[in-house]
């Protein structure tokens, strides 16, 4: 039985209001030129590609929006339940007979950090969103499934949202099943610092975790830029520093230039403290 795959693709930094969709199984694109989630769509420019009239399956022959840079150091994570990888989550939203997908990271007892443009794929109903922490592939979800309960968008322009999820069928909270990630206070984050972006890119087999390795190239306000490659589906991926602390949430990129995340500065940290009682910021 064929499935349709939708994914979010593009949001230009010059016009933060425009978000484009790409197909979910393979496209998780980033912001500035591309939004790197597989979810949601408001940009009509890509609708003819991703509309429900198209039956899109994962395939090496399909094209998808991406920001692949000269540094394309990406590798699959197989030990997804070990260390800081445990909190990295695959996000899935059924839509138009197919689905959209993105990435996120567990940061509290019930809370996931991801992008606004990812959760917007649920069309206002958080229960349409399912979260699979530590997913290995589409047939192996070692830490099960959690369903969205509430969406809390960041009040500023930055592409950041908290997704609060309900306990699972065993009445366990997501933060009990996996260890929530630690947030960096970012007091020591610097240009040329080594970082990784870990999530579920759409050009790889569905729901497989991949890590991109690179360096910080710019820090300003609520934006962090880096020289590593990402693809649609990476939207919402955590950006980790060398201590495996989250310093940003990936959202998009500019072709042939850089990829970007929401930088967790003092204002973002206060937003997290106000909405996540057990947030761990160090």
UniProtKB/Swiss-Prot annotation:
Statement: the UniProt record of this protein carries the keyword Protein biosynthesis: no
InterPro entries listed in its UniProt record: Glutamyl_endopeptidase (IPR050966), Peptidase_S1_PA (IPR009003), Peptidase_S1_PA_chymotrypsin (IPR043504), Peptidase_S1B (IPR008256), Peptidase_S1B_tx (IPR008353), V8_ser_AS (IPR000126)
GO biological process assignments: proteolysis
Propeptide segment residues: 28-66
Catalytic activity: Preferential cleavage: Glu-|-Xaa, Asp-|-Xaa
Residues making up the signal peptide according to the UniProt record: 1-27
GO cellular component terms attached to this protein's record: extracellular region
A UniProt-annotated Pfam family: Trypsin_2
Family per similarity comment: Belongs to the peptidase S1B family.
Annotated function: Exhibits a significant hydrolytic activity for the carbonyl side of glutamic acid. Shows activity toward human fibronectin and type 1 collagen.
Protein name stated in the entry: Glutamyl endopeptidase
UniProt organism field: Staphylococcus epidermidis (strain ATCC 35984 / DSM 28319 / BCRC 17069 / CCUG 31568 / BM 3577 / RP62A)
């Amino acid at each position: 039985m064929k499935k349709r795959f939708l994914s979010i693709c593009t949001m230009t930094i010059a016009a933060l209001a425009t978000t484009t969709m790409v197909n979910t199984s393979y496209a998780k694109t980033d912001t500035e030129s591309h939004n790197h989630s597989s979810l949601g769509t408001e940009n009509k420019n890509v609708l003819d590609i991703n509309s429900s009239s198209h039956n899109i399956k994962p395939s090496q022959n399909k094209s998808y929006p991406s920001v692949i840079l000269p540094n394309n150091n990406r590798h699959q994570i197989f030990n997804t339940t070990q260390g800081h990888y445990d909190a990295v989550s695959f996000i899935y939203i059924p839509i138009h007979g197919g689905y959209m997908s993105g990435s996120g990271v567990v940061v509290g007892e019930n809370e996931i950090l991801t992008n606004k443009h990812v959760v917007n794929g649920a069309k206002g109903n958080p229960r349409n969103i399912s979260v699979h922490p530590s997913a290995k592939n589409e047939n192996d979800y070692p830490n099960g499934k959690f369903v969205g309960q509430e969406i809390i968008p960041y009040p500023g322009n930055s592409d950041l949202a908290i997704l609060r999820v309900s306990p699972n069928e065993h009445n366990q909270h997501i933060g009990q099943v996996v260890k929530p990630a630690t947030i960096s206070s970012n007091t020591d984050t610097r240009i040329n610092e080594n970082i990784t972006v870990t999530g579920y890119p759409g050009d790889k087999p569905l729901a497989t975790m991949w890590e991109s390795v690179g360096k910080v190239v710019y820090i300003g306000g609520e934006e962090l830029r880096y020289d590593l490659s990402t693809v649609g589906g990476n939207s919402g991926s955590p950006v980790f520093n060398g201590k495996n602390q989250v310093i940003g949430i990936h959202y998009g990129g500019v072709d042939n230039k850089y990829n970007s995340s929401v930088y967790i500065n003092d204002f973002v940290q206060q937003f997290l403290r106000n909405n996540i009682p057990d947030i761990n910021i160090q």
